């Protein structure tokens, strides 16, 4: 299984994501520039956190129009795994690969801390190594992390089990329904504001993010080999 980590101007978590996959999980992973137009040969793609294009207009709004995005959308439509954390999540919503959007935190401040999460759906490509309703702790670091969608969309997300992670004991940004991460209807696209790549080794304070990558690698290999 070969994974692409896309690098946009202003990405600053691409190295974290790459090292979590390469150094900790020993996965086959490569950096891919936003200028490229093809993801041929890759089985999954990941969009890192950061401040693509300085978050001008809206977080992720400009990155959505880069050369690489049609290839990412193509992979998503083919059912291949697509993952976005923080700014990556924002880009996925701007591209229409995930419903809703991310707006400024209710506090109007940048929030950087580790928060407790509930695993709401462990039956996805990305969460099979977790248990439903399990409590985990992952870091967040964002100013525009408040998830918003209209009531119809929220009802559909809940009915289709598309809410994967929820803020457990406190809502750090004002996200509706305490949503921290969602998938598309097919379950192959996941976006989340917390940073699992920052919680893959004990020295980092938590390994709760490691199982997300282990889930993806195990399920992705099964799909590729099939």
From Swiss-Prot:
Alphabetical list of SUPFAM superfamilies matching this protein: Class I glutamine amidotransferase-like
Positions of the catalytic residues: 86 (nucleophile), 195, 197
Gene Ontology biological process terms from the UniProt entry: 'de novo' IMP biosynthetic process
Pathway: Purine metabolism; IMP biosynthesis via de novo pathway; 5-amino-1-(5-phospho-D-ribosyl)imidazole from N(2)-formyl-N(1)-(5-phospho-D-ribosyl)glycinamide: step 1/2
Keywords: ATP-binding, Cytoplasm, Glutamine amidotransferase, Hydrolase, Ligase, Nucleotide-binding, Purine biosynthesis
GO cellular component: cytoplasm
Location within or outside the cell: Cytoplasm
Residue ranges constituting the Glutamine amidotransferase type-1 domain according to the UniProt record: 2-226
Pfam families: GATase_5
Gene Ontology terms, MF aspect: ATP binding; glutaminase activity; phosphoribosylformylglycinamidine synthase activity
Reactions it catalyzes: N(2)-formyl-N(1)-(5-phospho-beta-D-ribosyl)glycinamide + L-glutamine + ATP + H2O = 2-formamido-N(1)-(5-O-phospho-beta-D-ribosyl)acetamidine + L-glutamate + ADP + phosphate + H(+); L-glutamine + H2O = L-glutamate + NH4(+)
Superkingdom assignment: Bacteria
SMART domains noted in UniProt: GATase_5
Positions of disulphide bridges: none
Predominant location category: cytoplasm
Cited Gene3D superfamilies: 3.40.50.880
EC code: 6.3.5.3, 3.5.1.2
Described purpose of this protein according to its UniProt entry: Part of the phosphoribosylformylglycinamidine synthase complex involved in the purines biosynthetic pathway. Catalyzes the ATP-dependent conversion of formylglycinamide ribonucleotide (FGAR) and glutamine to yield formylglycinamidine ribonucleotide (FGAM) and glutamate. The FGAM synthase complex is composed of three subunits. PurQ produces an ammonia molecule by converting glutamine to glutamate. PurL transfers the ammonia molecule to FGAR to form FGAM in an ATP-dependent manner.
HAMAP family found in the cross-reference section: PurQ
Assembly description: Part of the FGAM synthase complex composed of 1 PurL, 1 PurQ and 2 PurS subunits.
Name of protein: Phosphoribosylformylglycinamidine synthase subunit PurQ
Taxonomic lineage from the root: Bacteria, Bacillati, Bacillota, Bacilli, Lactobacillales
């Amino acid at each position: 299984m070969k994974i692409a980590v896309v690098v946009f101007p202003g990405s600053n978590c691409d190295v974290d994501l790459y090292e979590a996959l390469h150094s900790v999980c020993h996965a086959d992973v490569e950096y891919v520039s936003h200028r490229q137009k093809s993801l041929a040969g890759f089985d999954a793609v990941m969009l890192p956190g950061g401040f693509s294009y300085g978050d001008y207009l809206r977080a992720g709004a400009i990155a959505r129009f880069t050369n690489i995005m049609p290839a990412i959308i193509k992979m998503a439509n083919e059912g291949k795994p697509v993952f976005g954390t923080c700014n990556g999540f924002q880009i996925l919503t701007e591209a229409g690969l995930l419903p809703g959007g991310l707006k400024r935190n209710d506090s109007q401040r940048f929030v950087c801390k580790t928060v407790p999460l509930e695993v709401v759906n462990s039956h996805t490509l990305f969460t099979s190594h977790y248990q439903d309703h399990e409590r985990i702790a992952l870091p967040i670091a964002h100013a525009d992390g408040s998830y918003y969608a209209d009531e119809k969309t929220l009802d559909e997300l809940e009915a289709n089990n598309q809410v994967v992670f929820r803020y457990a004991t406190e809502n750090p940004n004002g996200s509706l329904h305490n949503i921290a991460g969602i998938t598309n209807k097919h379950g192959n696209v996941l976006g989340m504001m917390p940073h699992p790549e920052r919680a893959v080794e004990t020295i980092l304070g938590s390994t709760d993010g490691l199982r997300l990558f282990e889930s993806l690698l195990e399920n992705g290999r099964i799909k590729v080999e099939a």
